[in-house]
A protein has these predicted regions:
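Active-site bordering "gate/hinge" segments
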Residues: 1-292, 308-309, 347, 385-387, ...
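Dual-mode signal for accessory low-complexity, basic/Gly-rich regions
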Residues: 230, 254, 268-434
Length: 434
């Protein structure tokens, strides 16, 4: 099946229906995966899928749909139905599609190495059996993906991508006797990521997966903050790379369409100002495994620095968001971000904490519009006088996300690279534990 030909036929079908502007994406994905279930290899399979996404505008009214039947007859039916859907949509002069954009990206291993997948799965199982036998891999996957797409618009844009990459993921818990002999279970945790070279390192050493599995075995027995610290206190958190990615997602949301259009962004009028610790340098990496520098609305996404020594350099409204707000359009991609490593070795970063916790996962819910939040810290360990101690249970922290970005006092030299993001450990002061 010729994806470009399908996309061209779809554009023609929408034009026949009188669309003023349109965008189509024809895509095909081939997935090969080795699955692990309950610490045993369970399934080897290959699947293929195809999809066509249609978007049409009639008199400022937008409608979109997806279909898996890519025959000319199905395209005609879908285009007609889309016009009917648009008739019931609200008019919005900000709706539009890209014009004159062009790029062709081909990158990564396009053919699957099945032996690399089976070797990676076997290495994960061997690591679990020898290093973390009390931990169960509830679900695990070693996979190869080949993803192709052709994006065309009525404005003459043509953006194509053909990407290949490998993925690993592990999800599990640990179970064993506590100090009193009672069998207990840890909370769940997970890890994983994408790479273009699966054989360059052991599977357990990638994406922090091995460390995550070890930490689960230490989390069978937990303590509350009353046992560890005597009760409520104000202290520091050391955010793991996964928790740092969660923290930065709030920042991304603040500079994207929803917050900018609603007026709830705390940063809309602060471009050029220092909004975070001078230790923070946040930039794009839109050439990471499985990532193409193409925005969802059909624009080439150039390299971007969002934070430079804590200074906010730009907002990131989409084409629609820019037309809605009057702000400059900045094309971006959802994943592919990196925070620069710091000068502090991780061991020193931990030793600098008087009282606090290493936070594996940060569950903040939906922070208030000003950044206030109250959340549970998960897969976390107490730090007392620089020593990492017991796993914590039922522990909450209260604070403000914007303040956390400003209160970063150390950034580790080490980072974890999952493909979609590359993050260090970050120490933040002044959080309230309860």
């Amino acid at each position: 099946m010729d994806l470009q030909r399908v996309a061209e036929l779809a554009l023609t079908a929408l034009k026949r229906e009188g669309a003023d502007a349109s965008q189509v994406i024809a895509s095909r994905t081939a997935l090969t995966e080795v699955n692990i279930n309950l610490s045993e290899p369970s399934l080897l399979r290959s699947t293929q899928s195809q999809k066509l996404t249609l978007l049409g505008l009639w008199d400022g009214r937008k409608a979109s749909t997806e279909l898996s039947d890519l025959t000319p007859e199905a395209l005609s039916v879908a285009a007609s139905a889309l016009r009917a859907d648009a008739a019931a949509a609200p008019q919005d002069a900000a709706n539009g599609v890209s014009s004159g954009q062009g790029i062709a990206i081909v990158r990564g291993p396009l053919e699957s190495d099945l032996s690399a997948l089976t070797d990676a799965a076997a290495e994960l199982l061997e690591f679990r059996a020898s290093q973390t036998p009390s931990m169960t891999i509830e679900e695990g996957v070693a996979s190869h993906t080949r993803a192709e797409a052709q994006l065309l618009t009525s404005g003459g844009s043509h953006l194509s991508r053909t990407l290949g990459w490998y993925g690993l993921s592990v999800f599990g818990t640990a179970r064993g006797p506590g100090r009193d002999g009672t069998v207990r279970s840890s909370s769940f945790n997970y890890g994983g990521g994408e790479t273009e070279d699966l054989r360059s390192a052991p599977a357990s050493s990638r994406f922090g997966v091995g460390d995550m599995m070890r930490e689960l075995t230490r989390s069978i027995e937990t303590k509350g903050i009353a046992d560890c610290f005597g009760g409520k206190f104000t202290g520091d958190v050391v955010l793991t790379p996964m928790a740092v990615a969660t923290l930065l997602e709030w920042l991304h949301e603040q500079v994207r369409d929803m917050a900018l259009i609603s007026g709830s962004s705390v940063y809309r009028d602060r471009v050029g100002e220092v909004i975070a610790s001078p230790l923070l340098y946040l930039s794009s990496r839109f050439d990471g495994p499985g990532i193409a520098a193409i925005s969802a609305d059909g624009f080439v996404a150039p390299p971007l620095q969002l934070l430079n020594a804590g200074r906010l350099t730009t907002l990131t409204p989409s084409f629609y968001g820019s037309r809605k707000t009057g702000l400059s359009h900045v094309p971006t991609v959802a994943s592919g971000w990196q925070l620069a490593s710091g000068a502090t070795p991780l061991a020193d970063l931990m030793q600098g904490v008087h009282r606090g916790a290493v936070v594996g996962r940060l569950s903040m819910g939906n922070p208030a519009s000003n950044g206030d939040f109250s959340g549970v810290i998960k897969n976390s360990f107490a730090i007392n006088n620089g020593e990492v101690g017991a796993a914590l249970s039922e522990t909450m922290i209260n604070g403000n996300v914007a303040h956390m970005l400003r209160d970063v006092v150390a950034v580790s030299a080490e980072r974890i690279d999952t493909g979609g993001w590359c993050m260090p450990w970050v120490r933040v002061s002044g959080l309230h534990f309860s």
